Amino acid sequence: MSVDPMAYEAQFFGFTPQTCLLRIYVAFQDHLFEVMQAVEQVILKKLEDIPNCEITPVQTRKCTEKFLCFMKGRFDNLFGKMEQLILQSILCIPPNILLPEDKCQETNPFSEEKLELLQQEIKELQEKYKVELCTEQALLAELEEQKTVKAKLRETLTFFDELENIGRYQGTSNFRESLASLVQSCRKLQSIRDNVEKESRRLETQ
């Protein structure tokens, strides 16, 4: 059998020409074996009808096998020639013929050099895409950080607004005065707390 892959023919037919011929070869061999078995059975039956026949079934089987080997050898020789003819003249696509799906190659030929350049360009674009993706992730992380800082800043401003409102409530319109008043109040509260703790410890020791 031929060893040429014939990939273009396989693309067109949907099967390799060698596979087709191999199936024909196997089918003929199977048919030849079946025919020889049937012929052998007929010969044995005819020999049984002959009185005092000296030909035994074993001899008949040997003769049948020899004839089968002869027929198989002849067929292999003829099939080799037939295979070569079919592969070269029937199941073969001429070099100047393009399949419909490959017609674009005729109008837009693409060489190996162009393919290498295209692959290189694709590789460079993939690298650029990775860089852009990393940059985008970094920007998103920075944006989230800015959102967090903005939220904290808003809380701080709200806190200062509340301090200013407290100052107005206490009669001080200036923020510094309000802050000083608040610090003074905190110190008074801390002093009161310290006195309470001291008194509590004194009572516990008594």
Swiss-Prot record:
Instruction: Give the domain of life.
Output: Eukaryota
The subcellular location is: Chromosome, Centromere, Kinetochore
Residue stretches in coiled coil: 102-206
Q: Does the keyword Cell division apply?
A: yes
Q: Name one GO biological process term.
A: kinetochore assembly
Q: Which residues form the signal peptide?
A: none
Principal place of residence: nucleus
Cell cycle is among the record's keywords: yes
| GO cellular component assignments | chromosome, centromeric region; kinetochore; MIS12/MIND type complex; nucleus; spindle pole
Q: Which UniProt keywords apply?
A: Cell cycle, Cell division, Centromere, Chromosome, Chromosome partition, Coiled coil, Kinetochore, Mitosis
Q: Tell me the protein family, please.
A: Belongs to the mis12 family.
Query: What is the annotated role of this protein in its UniProt record?
Result: Part of the MIS12 complex which is required for normal chromosome alignment and segregation and for kinetochore formation during mitosis. Essential for proper kinetochore microtubule attachments.
PANTHER family the record matches: PROTEIN MIS12 HOMOLOG
What does the annotation say about its assembly with partners?
Component of the MIS12 complex composed of MIS12, DSN1, NSL1 and PMF1. Also interacts with KNL1, CBX3, CBX5, NDC80 and ZWINT.
Q: What is this protein called?
A: Protein MIS12 homolog
Q: What species is given as this protein's source?
A: Mus musculus
